[in-house]
Amino acid sequence: MKKNDFLKPKLVDISTISSTHAKISIEPLERGFGHTLGNALRRVLLSSLPGSAVTEVTIENILHEYSTIEGVQEDVLEILLNIKKLALVLPSKDTLDITLRKKGVGPVLASDISDNPDLEIKNPNFCLANITNDKTELVINMTVTKGRGYQQAQKRKFNELDDLGIGKMQLDA
């Protein structure tokens, strides 16, 4: 009869590369166990790490996400997808309303968001849109919310008193 002992890791090496990046080596492992452990670790991290994201967007003079903005290269849906890529940190508050206001030709960057001591933008050079007309002014109001895991906009619980009127676009976070 064959022995049913599993290989047990003899070496666990953790090397910190930066404040947000580390490399963990565990060896030896049975064939296929590396993928199993990696997937489990990824799922746990995605579901339990706290973070901040934009959950609601209102763009001046826009009623829904399928609109276009005259003088802006991207359509509203593309701008919303870019907003979802913002890397934001709310160190002290749970929610925060912020405004982005840009007029004139050129890229609309994350750094164009109004300065707020309660908000830290980790990717300030990220391009959200491109204005192609001198007379175009882009005004975007956003709500940043602190949370944990991934939350679909449809599954988010809304207070019955909240005004989810025309023009307020909800984002997954």
Where does each model-flagged region fall?
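Protein-protein interaction/assembly regions in multi-subunit complexes
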Residues: M1-A173
